[in-house]
C-alpha cells in the first residue's frame, strides 16, 4: 500500500478517546547520552553494504530568518570551543546540495516554527518569503510548531499550504515571488498528531506521513514520520487558539507508532516540536534535560530516531529507548544555524532499522561557501519588496501620539491603541478562522496594558506627526508602532472581575513601594480612582462608566485586550477568569489596517481616567510610582524579537 492510501486510511479520525487509552508510561531514570553513533561500525561507509541507506536532513525553528540570524545566534560553538559563523538560506542551499550528493534515499524535513518569525520581510508579508525559500530548498514535509498557529489553523492550511489569498484586513495578501509569479503555497505538507479541534476532537492536520525508499530488486520500503506539536500551544500568547487543543505527546506518539507498525511500516521517525538542552557543543550532548528528553526515554521502542525543536538548542546524541537500544536524539538549533543529518540503514528484506548502524551529525550552516544564486535572489527580492511596501502610505495623521504617562496613567498613544482594540474586536473575523464564535460578538470595552509589570506593552513607539497638516503614515511606521505578533482576544468577564483588574493596577513592590501599572481604556469608558485609598480599594463600582452606564459587578462584559493580558501574563490575574474567548486578528496585521480604515488619525480624547481627591496629586507619588514603559531593544527587527531577547537576558526560557 502506497503512502497516500495509508495516510488516507488513518486520516483525521478522532484522537481524544484513542490517545487517552494508549499506555505509554514506563519506569526510567535520568541518563546521559552516549556518542552520536550507535556502534563503531555505524560511521563506517563500508557498513552500508547490503543495507538500504537512508539520509534524514533536518532544520528547525527557522522563524523566517532568510538572510541571516540575529547577531546573538550568528555564531555557534562546536567541539573544543571552536566557533562558526552561520546562517542564511543561500548558504544552506549550497550545503544541502553537497550533503545530498550521491544519496538516493534522502529526505529533508523540519520539526516546526519555520515561519511566523521575526525577520522583517517574512513578518510583514504573510510569511510568503519563508515558504518560497523552503520550496526552493526542497523541503519535503514539516511538523506544525506553535508558531505555525500564530494566525489560525485555517491560515496554515488554506494560505500556507494551498496558496489561497489571505485578506488580512486588506493589508496582507498574495505577493509576487522572486520569479514574478503569485504565491502558490507550500510544495510540502504540515503534520501534527496531537493538535486537534477543541469541538470535534479531530486532528486539524494529518498525524503522520509515510515516505518510500528504493530497495534492491526494484522494491520500495516505507518509513513513517510521526509529528508532535508542543503541548499548550493553544494558550501561548502568539498562538492563542480557543478552538484548538493539544493532546498528550507521549500518548499520541505511541498511538501513531502502534498504528504504523500495524500497517507494516518497519522504520519510524518522531519529529516533535518540543525540545531539550544538552550542553553547549552543537554536535554532541551532555546532561540532557527538558520535556523532549523525558519523552525520548519513554516513547515507543518502535521509534528509531527522535528529532526535536522549539527550545532553540543544539545537540546530537544517542539515547536508549525503553528497551535499552540506542537511537538518535537530536536538535539543530534555530534560525538556520545547522543542518542535522541522521543516517539509517534498513534491512533490505524486512525494512526495519539496523540500530547498530545508525549515526547522526549536526553540520554548521557556515557562510564560507558560495551562496546559491537562486536562493540569494529569493532573499534579495523579498527584502526589496518589503522595503518598498513598508514605505507605502496607508493613512495620514493630524496629531501626535505619545507614550508619556500623565499622573493619572493616561497617554495619548495608550488611548489611541485602546480605541483600535475596540474597533478590531468589532470587525469581521479572519476569513480562514473557522473556530466557534461566541454568542455575543464584538466587545463592550477595551483594556490595554500600557506599562505592565510583567512582559512588554503592545505599544512600541510614539507616533509623532511632522510639521505638515496631514502628515503621511507609512505601513512600516504603523507596523512598528504597535504589536508583537499576537492576537487581540475578547472574552466575557464579570463586572466584579473587571473591577478587580482595575484594582490590580496598583501593587506594592518588593521594597514596599506602591507602584502603578496603568491600563488604557477605550473612548466609551470613564472611571476615577481614589488616590488616598488602600491597595485593592481605589476604584468604586459606581466610579466606572461604560457607554454612559455605571458598571454593575454582577453583569457580564465583553472585554477585548491582548492575549498576554487576558491570560494573566501582564500582571492582571483577575482577567484570567474569563468565558467564551474569541480570537481576533494579529496586532501587527490589525493596527495598520485600523490606520488605513480611518484614513486620518485625529487627536484622541483624554480625561478617560481621573483622580480624586485632586489635591492628593501633590505630591505625585500619591497615585503610585508609575511603571516605566520599556524601550524596544535597539537593533532588533521587531517587537517579538525584542521580547525574546529580554526573556533570554532575564534568564528565562522563552516560549519560542
Where are the predicted features?
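Generic structural signal for alpha-helix starts
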Residues: 1-3, 300, 372
Amino acid at each position: 500500500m502506497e503512502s497516500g492510501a495509508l495516510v488516507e486510511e488513518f486520516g483525521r479520525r478522532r484522537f481524544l478517546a484513542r490517545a487517552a487509552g494508549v499506555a505509554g508510561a514506563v519506569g526510567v531514570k535520568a541518563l546521559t547520552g552516549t556518542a552520536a553513533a550507535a556502534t563503531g561500525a555505524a560511521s563506517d561507509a563500508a557498513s552500508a553494504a547490503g543495507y538500504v541507506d537512508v539520509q534524514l536532513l533536518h532544520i528547525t525553528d527557522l522563524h523566517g530568518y532568510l538572510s541571516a540570524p540575529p547577531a546573538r545566534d550568528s555564531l555557534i560553538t562546536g567541539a573544543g570551543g571552536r566557533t562558526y559563523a552561520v546562517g542564511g538560506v543561500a548558504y544552506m542551499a549550497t550545503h544541502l546540495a553537497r550533503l545530498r550528493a550521491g544519496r538516493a534515499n534522502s529526505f529533508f524535513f523540519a520539526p516546526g516554527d519555520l515561519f511566523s518569525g521575526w525577520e522583517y520581510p517574512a513578518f510583514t508579508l504573510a510569511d510568503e518569503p519563508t515558504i518560497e525559500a523552503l520550496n526552493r530548498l526542497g523541503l519535503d514535509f514539516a511538523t506544525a510548531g506553535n508558531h505555525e498557529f500564530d494566525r489560525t489553523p485555517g491560515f496554515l492550511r488554506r494560505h500556507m499550504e494551498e496558496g489561497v489569498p489571505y485578506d488580512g484586513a486588506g493589508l496582507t495578501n498574495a505577493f509576487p515571488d522572486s520569479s514574478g509569479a503569485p504565491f502558490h503555497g507550500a510544495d510540502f505538507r504540515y503534520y501534527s498528531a496531537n493538535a486537534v479541534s477543541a469541538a470535534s476532537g479531530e486532528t486539524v492536520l494529518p498525524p503522520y506521513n509515510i515516505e518510500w525508499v528504493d530497495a534492491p530488486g526494484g522494491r520500495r520500503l516505507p518509513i513513517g514520520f510521526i509529528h508532535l506539536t508542543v503541548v499548550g500551544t493553544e494558550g501561548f500568547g502568539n498562538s492563542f487558539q480557543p478552538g484548538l487543543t493539544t493532546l498528550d505527546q507521549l500518548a499520541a506518539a505511541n498511538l501513531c507508532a502502534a498504528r504504523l507498525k500495524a500497517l507494516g511500516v518497519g522504520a519510524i521517525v518522531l519529529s516533535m516540536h518540543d525540545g531539550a538542552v544538552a550542553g553547549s557543543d552543537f554536535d554532541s550532548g551532555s546532561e540532557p534535560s527538558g520535556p523532549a528528553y523525558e519523552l525520548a526515554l519513554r516513547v515507543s521502542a518502535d521509534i528509531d530516531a527522535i528529532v526535536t525543536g522549539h527550545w532553540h538548542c543544539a545537540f546530537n546524541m544517542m539515547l536508549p529507548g525503553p528497551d535499552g537500544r540506542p537511537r538518535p536524539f537530536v536538535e539543530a538549533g534555530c534560525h538556520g544555524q545547522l543542518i542535522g543529518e541522521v543516517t539509517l540503514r534498513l534491512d533490505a528484506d524486512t525494512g526495519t532499522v539496523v540500530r547498530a548502524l545508525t549515526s547522526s551529525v549536526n553540520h554548521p550552516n557556515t557562510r564560507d561557501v558560495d551562496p546559491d544564486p537562486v536562493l540569494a535572489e529569493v532573499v534579495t527580492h523579498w527584502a526589496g519588496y518589503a522595503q518598498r511596501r513598508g514605505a507605502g502610505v496607508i493613512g495620514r495623521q493630524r496629531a501626535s501620539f505619545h507614550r508619556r504617562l500623565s499622573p493619572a496613567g493616561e497617554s495619548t498613544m495608550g488611548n489611541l491603541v485602546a480605541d483600535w482594540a475596540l474597533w478590531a474586536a468589532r470587525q469581521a473575523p479572519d476569513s480562514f478562522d473557522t473556530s466557534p464564535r461566541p454568542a455575543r460578538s464584538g466587545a463592550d470595552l477595551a483594556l490595554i496594558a500600557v506599562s505592565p509589570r510583567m512582559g512588554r506593552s503592545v505599544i512600541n513607539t510614539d507616533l509623532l506627526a511632522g510639521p505638515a497638516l496631514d502628515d503621511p503614515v507609512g505601513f512600516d511606521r504603523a507596523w512598528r508602532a504597535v504589536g508583537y505578533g499576537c492576537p487581540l482576544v475578547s472574552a466575557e468577564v464579570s463586572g466584579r472581575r473587571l473591577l478587580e483588574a482595575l484594582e490590580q493596577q496598583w501593587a506594592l513592590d518588593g521594597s514596599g513601594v506602591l507602584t502603578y501599572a496603568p491600563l488604557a481604556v477605550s473612548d466609551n469608558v470613564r472611571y476615577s480612582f481614589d488616590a488616598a485609598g488602600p491597595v485593592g480599594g481605589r476604584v468604586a463600582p459606581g466610579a466606572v462608566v461604560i457607554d454612559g452606564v455605571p458598571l454593575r459587578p454582577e453583569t457580564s462584559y465583553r472585554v477585548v485586550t491582548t492575549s498576554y493580558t487576558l491570560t494573566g501574563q501582564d500582571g492582571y490575574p483577575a482577567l484570567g477568569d474569563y468565558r467564551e474567548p474569541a480570537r481576533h486578528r494579529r496586532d501587527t496585521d490589525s493596527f495598520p489596517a485600523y490606520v488605513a480604515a480611518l484614513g486620518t488619525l485625529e487627536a484622541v480624547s483624554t480625561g478617560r481616567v481621573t483622580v480624586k481627591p485632586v489635591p492628593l496629586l501633590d505630591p505625585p507619588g500619591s497615585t503610585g510610582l508609575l511603571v516605566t514603559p520599556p524601550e524596544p531593544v535597539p537593533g532588533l527587527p521587531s517587537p517579538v524579537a525584542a521580547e525574546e531577547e529580554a526573556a533570554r537576558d532575564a534568564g528565562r526560557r522563552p516560549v519560542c
